[in-house]
Amino acid sequence: MGTAFNPAKTSLASWDAFRDVDAVVDAMLAELTAMAGTKPTRRGPKPPLAGAALRKAILAIWCVCFCGMQWRAIGQLCDIPFGTLYSLFARWTRLGLWRRLLNRLILAWRQACGDTPEPSAVIVDSRSCRSAPTCFGRGFDGGKKIKGIKIHLAVDKYGFPLAIHVSPANRHDSKGIVPVLHQLAGRGFKGTALGNLSYRGQRLSRAGEALGIAIQPSAGGHGGTFIPEGIRWVVERSLAWISRYRRLNTIFERTEGHLVAFIEIAFISILSRRLVRLVTQEISA
């Protein structure tokens, strides 16, 4: 299965997201250029954004995710109509821009670390978040006493997501993880998925066996102390990473796809900045 790898610093300076924000914008522009021949042409009388205006629009979408700003507020600050910004975000989400870019960055990171393109094992977990009344779904998590939604995540040993699913918070982990397993199977993954004791039951075991994925639950600690076994702590760190993005603390999204898109944008921000620093360290060395 391998061991967890922690190449990045955890000091406050390493979380200065605005310091390397140009890396995020450059990565998104590169992916837009790569998708130029596959995406449908824009309809309407207005010409599409280009140049500095396009960079400003991408930065505005990132600010909505990182700062938790409202669409109308960011539209006033960047002098771009909020309807234009939201339409760009929704359109790029439908085209799968964020997922494609995230997959490319994960592959680049694994290659930079000298690892294989595909993981041999994954770690799964979930996190309950409070949601607004206008959110796409609300459920009450009796264990954590949270009314909102639940994020189901499958990550590799570096903590980067391979599959993401969201559901109301009242859905049990053993049921909410099944769509994640289908996403993993769609990527061609067949192996072991590590998780906590919530991922038990014959129905979940049969679903995993049908997809070629063996789910291995393990205890999360002893004597009331939370200490994940093995490399299970990696997914806990991933959930802590995205908690720094304010749009993902209280959920306002009206569609599941938009929430998943913001989760992907958060990891794109983390990965693109780390890749830039990794290249800088190699050059300076």
Predicted segments, located by residue:
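Short alpha-helical elements
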Residues: 1-285
